[in-house]
């Protein structure tokens, strides 16, 4: 599985071992279910778990606690949305999505989109980053670092920015 994703295959031996440990934890703690008749294979489970484990490679796996299901659609899925404008008018629309993370609820992925990592975007990592971000109770781009009091938010942001630049 690691060889299927260049950004995972590039990890050193220690990082690969840690990624496998995090992946095993994730597979033991989350159910991965297919939607719209999708049969989720072992490769799919391992693929999702390995990619999802990258954001917590050197963090506590407990950061992914508080929810228990990953739902995988064969391709993009449609989500009904509504938005209220400044005049109070509610606009309802349907959005095509590759992924969705709900606070306290499941994480939803399009399998087709999990196979597309272009221009530095990876839907698995993106949605799992939202799960980290939502631990603080709202999505503001900064995950709760309570499990790691030694990590300083300013340093964390700088490391994230530097890592993203290298990833892209």
Enumerate the language-model features and the residues they cover:
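Active-site recognition of the HExxH zinc-binding catalytic motif
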Residues: 12, 119-136
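Cytoplasmic (intracellular) domains, linkers, and terminal tails of multi-pass ion channels
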Residues: 18-19
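Short, surface-exposed loop/turn segments at secondary-structure junctions
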Residues: 32-39
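Extended, charge-biased low-complexity segments
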Residues: 68-70
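Metalloprotease/metallohydrolase-associated module, dominated by Zn2+-dependent proteases
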Residues: 3-6, 14, 23, 27-32, ...
């Amino acid at each position: 599985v690691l060889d299927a994703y260049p950004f995972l295959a590039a990890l050193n031996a220690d990082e690969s071992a840690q990624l496998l440990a995090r992946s095993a934890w994730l597979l033991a703690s989350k159910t991965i279910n297919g939607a719209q008749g999708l049969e989720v294979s072992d490769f799919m489970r391992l693929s999702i778990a390995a990619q999802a484990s990258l954001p917590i490679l050197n963090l506590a796996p407990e950061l992914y606690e508080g929810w228990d299901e990953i739902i995988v659609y064969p391709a993009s899925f449609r989500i009904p949305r509504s938005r209220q404008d400044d005049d109070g008018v509610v606009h309802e629309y349907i959005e095509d999505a590759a992924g969705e993370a709900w606070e306290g609820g499941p994480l939803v992925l399009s399998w087709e989109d999990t196979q597309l990592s272009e221009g530095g975007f990876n839907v698995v990592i993106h949605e799992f980053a939202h799960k980290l971000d939502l631990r603080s109770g709202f999505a503001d781009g900064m995950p709760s670092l309570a499990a790691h009091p030694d990590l300083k938010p300013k340093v964390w942001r700088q490391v994230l920015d530097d890592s993203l630049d290298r990833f892209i």
